[in-house]
Amino acid sequence: MQPAYYENLEEIQNKYWSMLDDAVTNRASPFRIPVFMCAHQDEIDGRIVVLRKSDRENNLLQFHTDLRSPKVDILKKNNKASLLFYDKEEKIQLRVKVDCEINNQNPTTEKSWKKTQHISRRCYLTDSPPGTTSENPTSGMISKLEDFDYTMEQSEEGYKNFTVIKCKIKSIEWLYLAAKGHRRAKFDLETNKNAWLVP
């Protein structure tokens, strides 16, 4: 028996938003760690990010990064990007095209920083930016950080590097794999026009 969303566009939207919402708090969700892809000139770069917010009302997705990360420089030059989600058990793939907004030391980051746990804040306390060349294997952290030997007050030093990337969704392509026959659809969130596609 096929799921309700097999041939119903509205049910498809309800399904993928439910999966995105769940991924924000469910560490076991495959949708929690999508591939984020952005491009600069003739190079396309991809990496795993952690989904931190899903907002259906405003068509937004959100993740955190370090202001010194190379992807921030790329997004400053070209804010268009894509997120790729896949859930093996659900057999659902999402290709999400977005426009990105970089937030640093503003109300958006203040709100997210307050929710960021002690264990996660150390990522923003490294002396060297992400991607810096090193002669030896390294976490980039001094031993005190690796051992979590710092207070919440000391962790505030990392706030200047803490950055929130807001991804305004332009379109979503949904693919469902089924033995009976795959299903594929595109949802244009800018024009509110949806269409079935040949898988």
Please provide the spans of the model-predicted regions:
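Binding-site signature for planar aromatic cofactors or substrates
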Residues: M1-P199
